[in-house]
Amino acid sequence: MSGEESSAFSEEIRYLAHEEARPGQLEMIHDCLKALQQGGHHLAAAPTGIGKTAAALAAAIDAARTANGPRTIFFLTSRQSQHKIVVDTVRRLNARRPPQEKVRLVDMVGQSNMCVQPFAKESPPLFSLLCSQAR
């Protein structure tokens, strides 16, 4: 990336959880922003550890903050470990932001992970049946 391109991306760094971007993150942020601004989607396939979560969040936050009117970002994950990465990333990001610019985060986990009943850890079909009867 040239110096010109790097300075063009400097604004996106403000929404990263770390002071410096990992290789490939700035390009991903740029591609995500472009897709979001055009009302489209961006599908990223990259190796583990490149910082896809942080880059996607940085782009989404930038797009939300520069949009007309308030915007909400929904970040869905299929695993609790991925969920934790999103929460931790936002916490690290907020540690770098002034109070008036912090990102508000509401996180939710699956119903069986919030249930205090002993049957919550049973098989999903059994849990659904017992939970519906317990209501």
Language-model features, listed with the residues they occupy:
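A substrate-engagement module of RecA-like helicase motors
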Residues: 2-15, 19-23, 67-135
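Histidine (H) residue identity feature
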Residues: 18, 30, 41-42, 83
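N-terminal pre-P-loop "Q-motif" helix
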Residues: 19-36
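Generic hydrophobic, aliphatic-rich segments that mediate packing or membrane embedding
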Residues: 28, 53-59, 82-89
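Walker A/P-loop
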Residues: 38-59
